[in-house]
């Protein structure tokens, strides 16, 4: 896989996540007797952020476990494979957050929602993507058993985050009740996790034999 293939894969996966969240928003609003465009956009952008974050976990795990060894087997250097994987992750995150930002411009209070939703969404995409990356690396380094165990762990983490987010939304509203310090800390934590997973990827690609 060349660099443009990694970029293309990241873009396609991001567009699939965007389309899936949009369709889910449509289905949810069709069940609502009072359909309003502004509330439909608000609901859709919230689905986009959290669905995109969850899919970053699943997709990066799959790409790390499958596409990375495949790229090396077809002659890509370890340097090309590593940076290709990083480009995939960056393109996916950028497109998800760019789509969310553009959709927020169509809401009644775009800046109020953006001030909360974008930092939390970015943190979720980076953090869950990092977890997915670690899962893929464990599969490469220790085999299918480690990949399955990591997958189960990721599922438990995702369910826990989903339950917490659901309870928070019921209690405080979709974007309400968050202290300002969380809006600063969350993206920093997500970026830290992202960098940590990059280091683990680097060590894995350069120091371990990749099993096909």
Regions found by a protein language model. Give the residues of each.
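Hydrophobic alpha-helical transmembrane segments of membrane proteins
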Residues: 1-68, 80-212
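Short helix-to-coil transition segments within interhelical loops
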Residues: 72-77
């Amino acid at each position: 896989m060349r660099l443009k293939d990694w970029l293309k894969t990241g873009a396609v996966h991001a567009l699939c996540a965007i389309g899936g969240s949009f369709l889910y928003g449509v289905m949810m609003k069709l069940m609502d007797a009072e359909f309003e465009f502004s509330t439909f956009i608000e609901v859709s952008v919230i689905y986009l952020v959290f669905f995109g974050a969850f899919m970053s976990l699943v997709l990066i795990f799959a790409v790390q476990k499958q596409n990375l060894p495949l790229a090396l087997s077809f002659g890509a250097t370890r340097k090309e494979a590593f940076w290709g994987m990083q480009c995939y992750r960056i393109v996916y995150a950028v497109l998800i957050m760019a789509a969310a930002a553009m959709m927020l411009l169509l809401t009644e209070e775009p800046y109020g929602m953006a001030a909360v939703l974008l930092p939390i969404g970015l943190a979720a995409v980076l953090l869950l993507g990092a977890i997915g990356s670690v899962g893929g690396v464990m599969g490469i380094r220790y085999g299918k058993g480690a990949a399955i165990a990591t997958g189960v762990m990721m599922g438990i983490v995702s369910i826990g985050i989903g339950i917490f987010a659901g309870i928070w939304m019921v209690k405080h509203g979709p974007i309400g009740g968050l202290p300002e310090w969380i809006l600063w800390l969350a993206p920093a934590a997500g970026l830290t996790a992202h960098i940590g997973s990059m280091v683990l990827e680097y060590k894995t690609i350069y120091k371990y034999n990749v099993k096909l």
